[in-house]
Each structure stands twice: as C-alpha cells, then as structure tokens.
Amino acid sequence: MNTAVTLLTEQAPQPIEEFGQLERQIIIILDFGSQYSELIARRIRETQVYSEVLSYRTPAEHLRQLNPKGIILSGGPSSVYSDRAPHCDPEIWNLGVPILGVCYGMQLMVNQLGGEVAKADRGEYGKASLHIDDPTDLLTNVEDGTTMWMSHGDSVTKMPPGFEVLAHTDNTPCAAVADHEKKLYGVQFHPEVVHSVGGLALIRNFVYHICECEPTWTTAAFVEEAIREVRAKVGDKRVLLALSGGVDSSTLAFLMHKAIGDQLTCVFIDQGFMRKYEPERLVKLFQEQFHIPVEYVNARDRFLDIMSGVTDPEEKRRRIGHEFIQVFEETSKNLGPFDYLAQGTLYPDVIESADTNVDPQTGERVAVKIKSHHNVGGLPKDLRFKLVEPLRKLFKDEVRKVGRSVGLPEEIVQRQPFPGPGLAIRILGEVTADRLNILRDADLIVRQEINQRGLYNEYWQAFAVLLPIRSVGVMGDQRTYAYPIVLRIVKSEDGMTADWARVPYDVLEAISNRIVNEVKGVNRVVFDITSKPPGTIEWE
C-alpha cells in the first residue's frame, strides 16, 4: 500500500462496527496525515491491544461512544500555526481518557491547551539521543540516552499550564512533555518507527500502565469472534468467494468454511498467468487435503487472446481486469444465485480507501470492487452482492497468524506477494504462450534454488522477469541469440520500501547456470540491484 505524507485523512474510514458496537478495549489513533499512522496502530496491536485509525475530524462525542481506553494523535506534515492546519475537536481534552500526542500531535496538544509552538531555529531529522529528565510514568524503563527518531521543523516554545518536561535532546528542549494529573502526554519523536530504540517500551508504558489496557486482542479471540459474526450476518444465505491462492483469499476461504461450511462456494479463475504448477497445486490442496470444494474455471485461452499485440503495462492490467469481470460474472450466474461476496479486504485497504458503496434501501455495503490484488476494477452494476469481510480489521501479519490458527499450510501462509495480473506483468512487452513457458521455467528454478537453501522466508519477493529483447551468446561452438532473464530479489518489511537482497554468490551462480542450461530460449541472466525507491519491486 502507498502511504503519502500529504494529508489524506478527510476521507478516513469510520470506526469498524460492521457487526455492532465494539466491546473490546480499544485505543484510537487520530490521523493528521502522517505516513506512520498505520504503523502506530500496528505497534499497539503488537501489545495485544486493539487499535483503529480514525480521521482527526472525528467528533469528541463519537469518540466518547466508542469508549476508548486511550487516544493517540498522530504526526503530520502541517504546522499548527498555519491557517490550514488540521485541528481536532477541542472537546477531546475533556473526555477524561489518556491522550498521547506524537510529533505534530504533541504540538497540537500544546497549542490547543495554551502553550506555544514556533518554527525551530534548527529542524531535527533522523536519530537523536533522548536525555530523560523524569524517568517515571511514560518513560519508565526507557534508557537515558536511548536513540529516538526525529522528524520536525517546529518546536514547543512555551508549555501549557500544568505541563512539565519529561525529556530533551541536544536540539529540542521539550522532546517529551506531560500533564500527569490529566494523563496528557506528548513526544516530539516517533516511538513507533524501528529506528526509535526505546519506542516500544514507551508505547507499552502508555498502553499498559497509563491506559491500563489488558492484552485481549489475540488470534484465538479474533477467530472465535469472526466465525460468530459471519454466522450471524450470513444466516442461511449462499456466499461466493474468488480464490487466488494468496494468503488473504486462502485464509478467508478457511475462515468462511469453518463458519458456514457448504454455504460457501469458492471459485478459482485460471487466467493462465500463474507460476508453474500453481493452479493444479492450489485446487488439489483445497479439495483433497482440506475438503473445501473449489470451482475451477479454465480461462487461459481467453486471457491470452486479449493480450495479443499489447505491450503497455497499464493496458495489460485493464484488459485482464475487464476479462476477469466477464468471466466472474458468467461463473457467478452459472453457479448462483448468491447473496454475499466474501472479500479479503484488510485494514490497510480500509484506512487508505474510501471506495465503499451503501445500498440506500438496506444500508448494507455492496461490492463495487473485487479485492485490489486481483486488479480488476469495479463489478458490473447488475451483479450486486452484499459484502462479508471478516478480515477487514486485520493487518497482513495478523492475517498470517489467523491463517496458521485455522490450519492453513505454511507454504500458503508464507507465500510471497504475487501481482494480480501475474506473469503478464513480469513479461515486458507482448505476452505470448512461448514467453510464458520460458518465464515459468526460469521462475521455477529461482524458487527451487532459494527453497532448497532455506532462504525463501529471508526475502520479501524473489522472482524472474523476462525482457523483450535478445542478446548474443555462445553455447558450445554455436552463436546464440536469445532472451535475457532478470533476477529480482528484495528484502522489505511491508513492500512500501525495499532493498535489493545481498544473495550469496553461490546461489546466484546456481540459479544462472540452471536457467541458461535448462530453459530453452535464454542465454543470459542478470541481477537487478535497484532499491525501492527509486525503482519499484515489479518491473511493470
């Protein structure tokens, strides 16, 4: 997902109350446009406490109804003294719950409560040593001199009444502040980022000691709740699910099948752009090993036909998406009728997208999109389902935990990200049957060599790319003129940024030797050493 620094919160999602009022303990993050708002929520959940990201515009009364144990104000790109700076409802200071302001959030707190903020003589960016003046409360067990990550051009110049300084850095006199009596806290740094060495300890102090939360957000509790809620929502109706083989749709299928059994129909549309042996393996795995019926639709020829002469990557995606809709529509009508579409929406999708549609008669959310990893755009307007989205509260790492808990095999749980258009966007230029076969064989070798050495889980993605050019080579005494294969192997935490992997030379050598000797039509292998940014992980 892409998280922009610019303010994106005006269309931030409403609280997730799809199955009624939340009963669990919750910490709310009010988003002021920070690139780290989602990360704050993830850090809170790592403490086994539930959290949600809401718009800074959320009224205090709405927050009161949610009954949060605490509120965190995110950072943001604005200056609080700017005319267009985003401000929260000032009534939140009277809610009587602990509040932690982070970077911009701290400056907003200071500004609204009677302090002053101004442009700093020197901005502070990157790592800084935190000197602790008050080691109690928020900073308990945070080591004096610990490294914290700074990113600010403004600073607090006057404290509000009742506040005191908890910590400072060489350039920032008010790096952490508090009104202990009202349980209002602010930090100028970002405790949520990995560079902040003492950040997790600070977050745990806020969650457990100040907000007095209990670690009740567990995988087992979620699965039990999700199954109960799916049954309550669906009743005896039929549900359709588009299976892709990825961890999201596979976890969704397992969870839905546990909840409603034969009321679920899984459809796998084979568009011909998956990796070698994957379609057969997927269907066999679900039907024979897990006893979850899958309707297999072989649409390879249809998708290959629409790729004829197409070289532009966006046009490839558009055509694949359009054809997927057509096949999906035909299949759903043949197998239907269905009342619900099970969709693998995750919480980052909820945070980032306002693409929802509400039926004016029932108030139900209805499908206007297939899950984004299918890259298929909107469904036809006459193909309307009510949505059931049991994973929409979860981040990706939480989905993997749920997958394991419901019995999903590790090969799917740990499956590396794979684009919806598949190999069609890993073949630069026109997609043909011959090029697909070449790339499938090369890609299989990459995965085999990495798997054999136990390196698969070391990399975010490891795959082959086929270039639409030919290079000169020599095999035996013969000159060759064949395709080059690009190896793309990267490390990443979340796909937002990535670094090229320092793959051992012997592994690269083995991959290269096997590809040029075993894959007909290839005589050269090159290794992509571009990070993201400036490059992207995929070539198209």
Curated annotation (Swiss-Prot):
GO cellular component: cytosol
Pathway: Purine metabolism; GMP biosynthesis; GMP from XMP (L-Gln route): step 1/1
Gene Ontology MF: a single term: GMP synthase activity
A Pfam family hit: GMP_synt_C
Catalytic activity field: XMP + L-glutamine + ATP + H2O = GMP + L-glutamate + AMP + diphosphate + 2 H(+)
Family annotation (Gene3D superfamilies): 3.30.300.10, 3.40.50.880, HUPs
Binding site for ATP: S244, G245, G246, V247, D248, S249, S250
PROSITE patterns per the UniProt record, alphabetical: GATASE_TYPE_1 (PS51273), GMPS_ATP_PPASE (PS51553)
Keywords attached to this entry: ATP-binding, Glutamine amidotransferase, GMP biosynthesis, Ligase, Nucleotide-binding, Purine biosynthesis
Domain (GMPS ATP-PPase): residue spans on this chain: 217-415
Enzyme class: ligase
Catalytic residues in the record: C103, H190, E192
CDD domains the UniProt entry points to: GATase1_GMP_Synthase, GMP_synthase_C
Sequence ranges assigned to domain Glutamine amidotransferase type-1 in this UniProt record: 26-216
EC number assigned by the record: 6.3.5.2
SUPFAM superfamilies: Adenine nucleotide alpha hydrolases-like, Class I glutamine amidotransferase-like, GMP synthetase C-terminal dimerisation domain
Reported function: Catalyzes the synthesis of GMP from XMP.
HAMAP family in the record: GMP_synthase
Known partners and oligomeric status: Homodimer.
Name by which UniProt lists this protein: GMP synthase [glutamine-hydrolyzing]
Organism: Nostoc sp. (strain PCC 7120 / SAG 25.82 / UTEX 2576)
Gene: guaA
